Amino acid sequence: MRNGRCLVTPFVTAQRLANLRNTLWNRQQIAFSTTTASSSTSPIQESSSPLSIRFEYGLPLLDVPLPSRNEPCQFTMRPLSDTIGSLCEFLRQEDRGIDYVAVYGTNGVKLATCTSIEHLLQFGSFRLRLNDKFFDVTVPKTGTMPYDSDKLRQLDDLRATVASLHAALCVDEYKLSREKKLLLQLENAETLLAPLHDAKRKIEQECEAHTDRVMWAGFAAMGVQTGLFARLTWWEYSWDIMEPVTYFATYSTVCATFGYYLYTQQSFEYPSARERVYTKQFYRRAQKQNFDIEKYNRLVTEVDELRNQLKRMRDPLFQHLPVSYLSNLEAEK
C-alpha cells in the first residue's frame, strides 16, 4: 500500500500542473483577443470637439482647428465641384503639420476621396480625422437640400424655358424698337453728313477744274515744244544741228520721269499723275475752307454700318432668331 500510495501522489501532482498550464494559456488568449479588439477598433475614438457646418452666401463653411498653430481656419466647400480629396488637400496645404487626414462615416467606415461634397452633405453628419484627433461634424438640415444636383438641373431647365418664352414673346417688340433706334441714329448721322457732302462736292468740282487746267497746260507745253523744234529744224537751222538738241531734250524728259519716281515712289503714268494733282489740290482747298476730312470719313463709316444693320434686321433669314442671338450679331458688328 505504501508503494501504491507513493505512485498515486506524483500522478495527482502532474494533473494539477496540467490544469494550471491550461488556465495560464486561456488567460493569455483572452488578453491577446482583448488587445486585438481594442487595436482593430482604434479608428473609432471619442472626438476631440464637435464641429458644425454653416452656410453663408449659399456656400458651406467649415471652421477646422489646425493642429500646428492650434487656431481655427475657415474652409469654403463647393458642393458641385469639390470632393473629399480636394478638402483633404486644402487642409494639408494650409497646415504642413498634418500628416494624415481622412473623413469617416458615423459607422466608422472611411469615405473615399472621390466622394463629392454634395454627397457628403447629404449624410447629415460625419467624422473628420486630423492626425490622431477626431472631430464630429454636423450639417444643418437646411443646408443639405439647396445643393441637390437634380434640383439645380430642374432650375436650369426652368430658366431655359422662361428664356425661350421671353424670346418668343418679345422678339418682335425688340426688333421694332431696335429698328426705330437705328433709323433715328441714321437720320441724325445723315443730317450731320449732308452739309459736309455739299462742301465736298464743291471742293471736288474746283479740284476737277484745276486738274483739267494743269493737264491741258502740259499738253500745250508739249505742243509749243514740238512747234519750236520744227521751226528751228526746217526754217532756222538744219537737222544736223537740231538732232543733238532733240536728243538732249528727250533724255532730259527721261531724267525728269525718273526724278518723279524717286519723289513719289510711283511710275510716271498720266492717270496716276492726274490723281496726284487732284488729291494734293483737294487737301489744300479742304484746309483752306475748314473742311474736316476725318469727321466726314467717320460719319460716312457710321452711316454705312447703320444701313448694314438695318439690312440685316430686315433680312427674312433673321426674322425668327432669338433676341440674344441678334444682340450678339450686332455686338460683333
Curated annotation (Swiss-Prot):
Regulation of this protein's activity per its record: Inhibited by ruthenium red or its derivative Ru360; possibly by obstructing the pore.
- The reply to whether Membrane figures as a keyword in the UniProt entry is yes
Q: Which reaction does it catalyse?
A: Ca(2+)(in) = Ca(2+)(out)
Annotated segments matching region Outer juxtamembrane helix (OJMH): 195-213
Entry's transmembrane regions: 215-234, 244-260
Topology check: give the Mitochondrial matrix ranges. 23-214, 261-333
Q: List the disulfide bonds.
A: none
UniProt KW keywords: Calcium, Calcium channel, Calcium transport, Coiled coil, Ion channel, Ion transport, Membrane, Metal-binding, Mitochondrion, Mitochondrion inner membrane, Transit peptide, Transmembrane, Transmembrane helix, Transport
Q: Transit peptide residues? A: 1-22
Function, in words: Mitochondrial inner membrane calcium uniporter that mediates calcium uptake into mitochondria. Constitutes a pore-forming and calcium-conducting subunit. Mitochondrial calcium homeostasis plays key roles in cellular physiology and regulates cell bioenergetics, cytoplasmic calcium signals and activation of cell death pathways. Required for rapid mitochondrial calcium uptake and mitochondrial reactive oxygen species (mtROS) production after wounding.
Name-wise, this protein is Calcium uniporter protein, mitochondrial
